[in-house]
């Protein structure tokens, strides 16, 4: 059903001059493949994974937003600056259209927090997304950060310092606990709000 539905939608979009982009190819297989003209924005998989390889061999085009390396809403305790910079997916079959960093903001409460999560990881992604492995140097990147930070200071961006972006074991543990608590509390509040909506609707229907 998933494959049939997505192919119908993609066909409709293409007839109207657009191009369908999906976040998952899990419902696609050799017997019932998704239309190869659908672009896969790889979010929940690694670009080095088997599913990506299979779909690429079928001629699919990709956008690389693979988790966790390009998920900027994840704490530095899970994916630090060094890991972000050194992520180097193998060349894929098919066509790689580009790279897009992702940040889900439901757990981010302020612009200050947003700045902290995005910078300087976005600079690492910008430098490495189209660079060959041989052209990359993490040490050179670190040496260029002071000048980058000077630019961010002009625009009052509240970035993570190098110590914060590559946290020690103790700081990593603290970040992890804070992030998990924030995530759990958000979902609790969301569930409470949904429960209240359901009760309100039930009252209206019973009137």
Name every feature range the model reports, one short phrase each:
Residues 32-35, 72-81, 111-115:
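Histidine/acidic-residue-rich catalytic or RNA/ligand-binding cores of hydrolases
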Residues 25-27, 43-45, 67-69, 102-106, ...:
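Active-site beta-loop-alpha junctions enriched in small/polar residues
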Residues 14-24, 62-66, 132-138, 160-161:
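Acidic/polar loop patches that form or flank catalytic/metal-binding clefts of enzymes
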Residues 101-116, 120-207:
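C-terminal functional modules
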Residues 1-39, 44-59:
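Active-site neighborhood of glycoside hydrolase catalytic domains
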Residues 1-8, 50, 94, 117, ...:
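Generic recognition of stable, solvent-exposed alpha-helical segments in well-folded globular domains
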Residues 25-31, 69-72, 141-145, 165-169:
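A glycine-rich phosphate-binding loop feature that marks nucleotide/adenosyl-phosphate handling sites
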Residues 48-103:
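Aromatic-lined glycan-binding groove of carbohydrate-active enzymes
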């Amino acid at each position: 059903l998933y494959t049939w539905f997505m192919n119908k939608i993609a066909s409709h979009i293409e007839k109207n001059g657009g191009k369908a982009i999906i976040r998952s190819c899990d419902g696609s297989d050799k017997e019932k493949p998704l239309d190869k003209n659908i672009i896969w924005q790889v979010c929940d998989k690694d670009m080095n994974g088997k599913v990506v390889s299979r779909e690429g061999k079928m001629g699919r085009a990709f956008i690389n937003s693979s988790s966790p390396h390009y998920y900027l809403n994840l704490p530095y305790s899970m994916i630090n600056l060094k890991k972000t910079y050194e992520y180097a997916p193998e060349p894929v079959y098919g066509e790689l259209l580009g790279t897009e960093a992702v940040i889900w903001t439901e757990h981010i409460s302020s612009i200050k927090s947003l700045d902290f999560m995005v910078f300087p990881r976005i600079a690492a992604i910008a430098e490495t997304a189209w660079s060959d492995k041989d052209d990359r140097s993490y040490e050179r990147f670190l040496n260029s950060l002071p000048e980058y930070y000077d630019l961010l200071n002009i625009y009052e961006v509240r970035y993570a310092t190098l110590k914060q972006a590559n946290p020690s074991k103790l700081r990593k543990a603290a970040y992890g606990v804070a992030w998990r608590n924030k995530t759990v509390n958000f979902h609790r509040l969301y569930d409470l709000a949904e429960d209240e909506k359901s009760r309100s609707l039930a009252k209206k229907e019973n009137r």
